Amino acid sequence: GIFRGFENIGTEYGMIMAILGGDDAGGGVHWAPQVVEDAADHGLILGENGKLYDQKKGQSLPDGIGPMPVMQSDELAKRPELTTMDVVPNHVARFWDMFALSDSRPVNVIGENGLLRDKPGFEVDFITRGSAVENLESHRFPSVLMPVRGHWRISWDGGSEVLAPGDTMSVPAELNHSITPAVTGEAALYQIKGNADPAGHTW
């Protein structure tokens, strides 16, 4: 694993989507020493249970829960330090590239044969107005829908729901449903589909 941080550097509302590979997703989050130290400077204590406690609000570590241990230098040395050239070509998919590639059918963003070739226990597709179809579909595993542009109508036997950008919908396994834009204009949506890939190395 590598350490990474996230910051909204624009002026508009920002949202981050994190997808974990099911119940065997790698053993949880490992915190960089700087994160633990910065939290303490602001009166925050990170517990070994992964929860944050705010001393300014009178919170403290529960009985039996110690502070998150600070990672030692020998453990830090095992973490790779990737360059921009390591990361961008193999691990970044740009919105407008995905938008263009999904003009007639959904583009597989993360998957064995995706733009980002990986098998983390799920696949991610990107769907736009041009690649959306009214035909019903279902999946063996649960899926998740997250619009990023436009409003989308999700219909199934007995109901429907309209999703706006930033909304999230969990679709049960084996549920026949359709995914179509609900209004005119630009429309784009992420579809995350679980699969049977085991946890562990990608290949």
Spans of model-derived segments:
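A short, N-terminal "cap"/entry segment at the start of jelly-roll beta-barrel domains
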Residues: 44-135
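Beta-strand elements of modular eukaryotic interaction domains
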Residues: 135-136, 180
